[in-house]
Structures are given as C-alpha cells and as structure tokens.
A protein has these predicted regions:
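Active-site acidic/histidine proton-transfer and metal-coordination neighborhood
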Residues: 56-57, 73-171
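Acidic/histidine-rich catalytic cores of soluble enzymes
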Residues: 123-228
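Aromatic/hydrophobic pocket-lining residues that form the small-molecule binding cavity
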Residues: 13, 48, 84, 88, ...
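Acidic (Asp/Glu)-rich catalytic clusters
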Residues: 18-25, 44-64, 89-99, 127-136, ...
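C-terminal helical cap(s) of enzyme catalytic domains, especially alpha/beta-barrels
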Residues: 262-281
Length: 282
C-alpha cells in the first residue's frame, strides 16, 4: 500500500511536504480550504504548481483532497445543497490543477428526509460534479460512521451509489474507524476477509481507491466517529495487519487521520509501517 497522513497546510506547502517526508509518507491528504466554511478561496496557481513539484521531489504520490466537513448533498435546504455542490466542484478543479489524484468526500445526512428522496438528491449532485471532472482525477465517496441518518454508512449503500452513477472516475474510500462503528468486525484476519469479500461483492474491489486507517475506542457498532492511535484501539494490530496483508488491497492508498501532534504522527506512521513489515506482533 501507499501509506501516508492527512497533513495540514496552514504553515505552507513546504512545511507540509517536509513533515510528510520526515515521517515516511508515500501519500498525503490535505484540505484545500477551510474545512468548516462554505466559502471557497481563490486558487493560487503558483502555490499549487510548487506543491506538485515538492511532492514529486519527495516521491509522495498520490495526493488526496478531503472536502470540507459541511458538505451535505442530501439536504432539503437549497442553500446548503448548492453550497455543498460548489465546494465539491471547487475541490475537483483544484485537484485537476494541482495534480492531485483523489477528491474524498462525505455525503452528508438525510436528516428527516425520506431516504429514497435523499439518495436521489445525492445521485443528482454527484452526477453534476462528475459531468465536469477532469481526466486523472477520481471522486471518492467515504463511508460514514452510521450515526443518526448519515448517508453512506453501509457497504451496500455505497455500492448502490456506484451502480446508479456508473462513472469510471467514481470510487470509494473505506475508513476503518467508521466501518468498525457501523458494525463491521475488522479486528482479525477472518473479519477483514469477510469485510473485503462483502465490499468486493457490493462495490467491486477495483472501485475501492483509498482507505482511511484509523483505530478507534468506540464499541463495535457504536455509531460514533472517534479516531484513535494505530494499534491502541479495538481494531488493533491484528486488524491492520490483515488489511495490509490482504492480496486484493496491496495496490491501494491508505491515509492515517489519527489524532494529536507531529510527534503522534511520527509514532502512528512508525507503527503502521512496522505492522506492514511484520515487525509488530499481535
């Protein structure tokens, strides 16, 4: 797998790439803008070009953009729905300009809306975004932790979206903490095998483009989005070892979104790389 971190760019692209390289990243994920606003900022083309060059020099590829948290493609509020689509389209444009392969997005919440109507609204929004997607960029739908009426919590629902849209540049990101919170028992080889088999059946393993590797202290099926340090939660060493060793997943990208500071980033990267190399026992 190409393993890396979500890195912050508030200190500039140079520092972000330096940090990623220092902790052993082969891939990275970033926010292109403030993740907690519907406002989009003007694109700094020179900075994007410099960022791409820095990544090439560091051997870091692919790069993913994570869209803002506020996106809700199922909303009945026209301002929210339209603002969400604008954010998604903006990140797809930035990715194309900056040589970033993936744009990873949450889908939002159905709220009190009929789920069939909400599903149709999500499909329409994604169809609109995909109609303008540039070559070499992939739109990646992330599974939710299953809380409340969040969209995309199950493998079956993600698969239904993939089939409904049937677009070659549409894929899926599977977050391990979210999967566990939804009830997928991925803390053993047997559990991971069942999970991957189910995902292949419903989504197609070729459509699984990314993973978010996060441990969690949430109980199985707890429906809460809480990330924790690799190997220190309920998924544990055995779960991540099984994911890393699975033959169908070896060409995938895995991004850590673990909590903490730069020292925690280094510790989590060292742990996941040691698991990959077989240096950590279960």
């Amino acid at each position: 797998m190409r393993i890396g971190l979500h890195v912050h760019i508030a200190g500039g692209y140079v520092k972000a790439v330096e940090h990623a390289k220092a902790v052993g990243c082969k891939a990275i994920q970033v926010f292109s803008t403030n993740p907690r606003t519907y406002r989009t900022s003007a694109t700094d083309f020179a900075a994007l070009d410099a960022f791409a060059q820095l990544r090439r020099e560091a051997g870091i590829d692919p790069c993913a953009i994570h869209t803002p948290y506020l996106i809700n493609l199922a909303s009945t509020d026209a301002k929210i729905a339209q603002g969400s689509l604008r954010l998604l389209q903006a990140d797809l444009a930035v990715a194309a300009r900056g040589g970033m392969r993936f744009v990873n997005t949450h889908l939002g919440s159905y709220g009190t809306r009929d789920r069939t109507e909400g599903f149709t609204a999500i499909c329409r929004a994604l169809e609109s975004a995909l109609s303008k997607i540039e070559p070499d960029v992939f739109l990646v739908l992330e599974n939710s932790a299953g809380a409340g009426n969040l969209a995309g919590g199950t493998i079956e629902e993600l698969g239904a979206l993939i089939r409904a849209l049937d677009h070659p540049q549409l894929g899926v990101c599977l977050d391990t903490a979210h999967a566990w919170a939804t009830g997928y028992e991925i803390n053993s080889k047997e559990g991971v095998d069942r999970f991957v088999e189910r995902a292949d059946r419903e989504i197609g393993v070729a459509r699984i483009l990314m993973f978010h590797f996060n441990d969690t202290q949430v109980p199985l099926g707890g429906s809460r989005d809480r990330h924790w340090h690799i190997g220190e939660g309920n998924i544990g060493f055995e779960g991540f070892r099984a994911l890393l060793a699975h033959p169908e997943l070896r060409d995938k990208t895995a991004i850590l979104e673990t909590p903490g500071n730069d020292e925690d980033d280094l510790r989590n990267m060292q742990t996941i790389l040691a698991i990959e190399k077989g240096a950590v026992s279960c």
